[in-house]
């Protein structure tokens, strides 16, 4: 009789263990993680982010409100790491790892490099932790980009595209 009572408890423990293991497999998320890395003039630049999908939604000005700090992807805070000091749009960014946040606007975006890189989304974002902010133009595209994508060109141009919006900043 005692063994019959143990079976449901054992089943629950196994189910919880399997569920926890599945959650650790980030590749199965609706917004899977991506990491891009490139050597730019002898500096290794790595960007880690998750790729949300458009899925028929209006993205900028809709899902992601204009004028609000955005995590620049999905899930955990997106981050960028540079192995040496670089210039971002002509402004110095010391070597290190930074949270990559943005403030989308219709005509221009603010790109933010923040001390807080290890968190969930932009919930723990604080302007006081900003290391550098640059403003760049926002461009409309004819083509719809379904998944948010960040690319690093050999020249050091970092490009972000989603829906019908594309934004770039230079890293030298």
Q: At which residue positions do the language-model features occur?
A:
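Bacterial Sec-dependent N-terminal signal peptides
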Residues: 1-25
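Short, surface-exposed loop and linker segments with low hydrophobicity and enrichment for Pro/Ser/Thr
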Residues: 5, 94-96, 102-105, 148-154
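Residue-level signal for beta-strand positions within conserved beta-sheet cores that form or flank
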Residues: 18, 107, 130
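Primarily secretory-pathway and cell-envelope proteins
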Residues: 23-68, 119-172
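Mid-length scaffold segments of soluble, non-membrane domains
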Residues: 71-119
